[in-house]
Design a protein with these regions (language model features):
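Nucleic-acid endonuclease domains
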Residues: 2-8, 12-162
Length: 162
């Protein structure tokens, strides 16, 4: 968004709790200076009722708080491993132990960013990441909080269990 109608980059996310899903881990790892806007909602039947908006001002000096010792190259090797797992349930099951060991080896337990590999029984092979609102606040990252009231028609997600 930076350069179009804004002098800043923004990442806009929604959550119905404390956890903020941040998408692709390598893309997020490259970003060091942006405003993270989080809309918090309550699911009321087929509507999401947004009640709180947080804006966290993520800056380069927060890199060690967010990522700890998880550098881009280390994460890229892990992502490459995950993406090259063959499609299907057999490969999903056969690689489970190794995936866990590798994830534990690269994870920095002191970092706010958490790693979430997505390997299903079909062909999904990607690595995402997340943060928690309360941990961002506790870490002292500058933020603004606003009470809002917006309702969006948006039924709960339905997952295909086949």
């Amino acid at each position: 968004m930076k350069g179009l109608l804004s002098i800043s980059d923004y990442s806009i996310k929604t959550t119905n709790g404390n956890k903020i899903d941040c998408g692709d881990i390598l893309r997020r790892r490259q970003e060091t200076d942006y405003n993270l806007v989080v809309g918090v909602y309550a699911q009321c039947e087929d509507n999401k009722v947004f009640h709180t908006e947080y804006t966290f001002y993520i800056r380069p000096e927060h890199e060690s708080i967010l990522w700890g010792k998880m550098n881009y190259n280390l994460l890229a090797e892990y992502v490459d491993y995950i993406k090259n797992i063959p499609a299907g349930k057999q490969a999903q099951q056969e690689t489970k132990a190794k995936r866990t060991v590798l994830k534990n080896c690269i994870t920095d337990k002191n970092a706010l960013i958490k790693i979430h590999p997505k390997v299903d029984s079909k062909k999904q092979r990607r690595v995402q990441c997340s943060l928690k609102i309360k941990q961002l606040i506790k870490a002292g990252i500058d933020y603004k909080v606003t009470t809002i009231r917006e309702t969006v028609h948006s039924p709960k997600r339905k997952f295909n269990c086949n």
